[in-house]
Amino acid sequence: MAQITGDTHEWFQDWANDYDATLGKVSRHHDLLDTAVKASGIRQHDRVLDIGCGTGLLSLKFLGAADCRIKAIDSSARMLALFQEKIERYNLADRIQCIQEPAEDMECAPGEFDIIAATVSLHHVKEKAPVIRKIYDSLKEGGRFVLGDIDMDTTGRLDDPGRLKRILDYLARELELAMKEGGVQAFERMYDNGKKHILNDGEYCISFDQWAALCRNAGFPQVDIIPLQEYQWFKVLVAIK
C-alpha cells in the first residue's frame, strides 16, 4: 500500500490477518481485479509492477493469465509476509519479487515495465501527481498503466455537508454489499474504512475524471475508462504510453 499515516498504517497491519477472508471474498473486488488484468493486455514474459500488492490477489491473477514476471510492492510488512507464504506455497519465487516499499518511494529504472497496475491502493497517496509521473517514466513505450478503484471524489472541506452526502451515497452501497457478501466481519471493516474516507484519514479518493487528467498531464496520450458492468461506481483506467 501507499505511504499512509501511522494510525492508518497500523489499521492495515491489523487487517492483514483477515484481508483475504473479508475483501478477498467480495465478488465485486474480484470483478475489479479480473477487469484490470483483461484490460492490461498482459502478454507472455511481460514485466509487471503491482503497486500496493497486499496479499497478492492481483499478482496471482496476472500469473494466471500469462507467464509474466512481477515486482510487487507494499508498505505493510504483514501483508507482504502473507503474500510471501503464498509465493513459497505455490513455488513462485522465480516469478514474483516482493519488496516493502511505499508508492511514493518506489525505485524503478526508466522504461523497466510493460505493465504497472494498482487496484484500490493509490487512493491512499495524498500527493498523486508525482507518483503518476514516476509510473509514466517507469513504463516502456507502449506500456500500460492500469488503475482499478472506486470512482468517488472525497476532495473538499471536511465540514461540507454536500461533500459528506456525496461520499455517503457511495458508502451506503458498499456497506450493504459488504454485509451481504462477507457478513458482519466484512461490514465492520468496511464501516471503519468508510469513516477514514469521510475524514480523509489515509484515504484520499478522487474521481476517475481526476485520475484521467493526472495521467494526461503526466504525458499519457491515450486514457480509457472501463466501468464494471454490475458495479458502475467501480472502474478501471488504462493509460497507454
Residue ranges and their predicted role:
Residues E107-I115:
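A short acidic, Gly/Pro-enriched loop at the edge of an enzyme's catalytic core
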Residues L49-I51, T55-D105:
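Class I SAM-dependent methyltransferase SAM/SAH-binding core
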Residues M1-R43, L57-K61, L82, G194-K196:
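Conserved class I S-adenosyl-L-methionine
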Residues P130-E141:
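A short glycine-rich, Lys/Arg-flanked "PGG" loop and its adjoining helix->strand segment in the class I
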Residues D114-E127:
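A short SAM/SAH-binding and catalytic strip from SAM-dependent methyltransferases
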Residues G143-D149:
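Conserved beta-strand signature within the Rossmann-like core of class I S-adenosyl-L-methionine
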Residues A218-K241:
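Core SAM-dependent methyltransferase catalytic element
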Residues I150-R216, D224-I225:
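C-terminal alpha-helical "lid/dimerization" subdomain adjacent to the S-adenosyl-L-methionine
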